[in-house]
A protein has these predicted regions:
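PLP-dependent amino-acid enzyme catalytic core
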Residues: 3-4, 10-341
Length: 341
């Protein structure tokens, strides 16, 4: 699948912060081309899907779980490190995450030869903690995600490290836009895209690229009821913070939306739908049964929406889903499924 035409520039330019163009996306693709995977798509044509999917015309799933570091997060993390100065690279980067962003920053830092510290909650899946260690990052274990963000801020202040935010900022949105551009370019027939929403880093970029390339396409976001910060933000007309988060999908468990990604979502996303945790559990099983993949809850969210609240919208349409990532241990995978309500 051909990338969008782009210049050979190896560094990101200075852009208007609230605008992303096709030229911006194609330039980012050039930067990422040598280090990332242009992930495959799988068409939902197998007879095994019969009786599961609504009456769609056709569909494809973009398999970002096969990306470097196991998720789409590698795109934005690598762009983020590439855009900092050489002086900043010498001081290193720091991130706070219990999810896929932790592994993505550790991977991107190793690739760029930059020191990385990752603040992670103690309850983080051991696979992710060990993965960060294996990539050469220093892991700081914290009480919870709030403590992890506090440690990240302290580390940045004390050591001069550059913060790599898990979803807010141009590099994260632009990285995800390269994913959206790949998908819509490979499958121009798709007219309805369903994309998981955590903090908004994935959908803000994918929706922007999709609408730039195929403006008539419909973009639907999906959030758990227990972590619906973007749904509530759009309802309020501004980025909001939730009082609490309660979902099995830790990768979608952001307690807040933030202004940068929220603004792109407001402009380019047609609707946000919500799903229950058990909807994701069922779709995790479906992915295992049909595609033989071990999908974490967030990875199964788009499928859960398609067979749930989006099923009527999808009738007669070509549908695109994204399997956004899957860094989950088998122990945690089975524990989540066994806890089904």
């Amino acid at each position: 699948m051909a990338l969008l035409a782009a210049s050979k520039s190896s560094t990101l330019k200075v852009y208007k912060m609230n605008s992303i163009s096709l030229s911006d996306i194609s330039e980012a693709q050039v930067i990422l081309k040598e280090v990332l995977v242009e992930t495959p798509t799988v068409q939902m044509k197998s007879d095994r899907w019969e009786g599961i999917l609504p009456d769609i015309k056709g569909g494809a799933i973009k398999m970002e779980l096969f990306q470097q570091a196991g998720s789409f997060k590698a795109r934005g993390a690598y762009l983020g490190i590439q855009q900092i100065s050489e002086r900043e690279k010498l001081k290193g980067v720091v991130a706070a995450s219990g999810g896929n962003h932790a592994l993505a920053v550790a991977w991107a830092a190793k690739k760029a030869g930059v020191s990385a510290k990752i603040a992670m909650p103690k309850a983080t899946d051991e696979m992710r903690i060990n993965g960060c260690h294996a990539l050469g990052a220093e892991v700081i274990l914290c009480r919870d995600i709030a403590d992890a963000f506090s440690k990240m801020e302290t580390c940045a202040s004390d050591e001069g490290r550059t913060i790599m935010h898990p979803f807010e900022g141009r590099h994260m949105t632009l990285g995800s836009a390269t994913c959206g551009a790949e998908f819509v370019t490979a499958h121009p027939e798709i007219d309805l895209f369903i994309i998981p929403v955590g903090g908004g880093g994935l959908i803000s970029g994918m929706a922007t690229a999709i609408k730039l390339i195929k403006s008539e396409a419909i973009v639907i976001g999906v959030e758990p009821y227990g972590a619906d910060s973007m749904f509530q933000s759009l309802k309020a007309g501004t980025a909001v913070k939730l009082d609490k988060v309660n979902t099995i999908a830790d990768s979608l468990g952001s307690p807040l939306a933030m202004p940068y990604s929220y603004e792109f979502v407001r402009r380019h996303v047609d609707q946000i739908l919500r799903i229950e945790d058990d909807d994701m559990r069922r779709s995790m099983r479906t992915y295992q049964d049909i595609l033989k993949i071990t999908a974490e809850p967030a990875c199964a969210a788009a499928l859960a929406a398609l067979v749930g609240p989006a099923k009527d919208l999808a009738i007669g349409k070509q549908v695109g889903l994204i399997a956004c990532g899957s860094n989950i241990s088998l122990d945690r995978y089975h524990a989540i499924l066994d806890a089904s309500g």
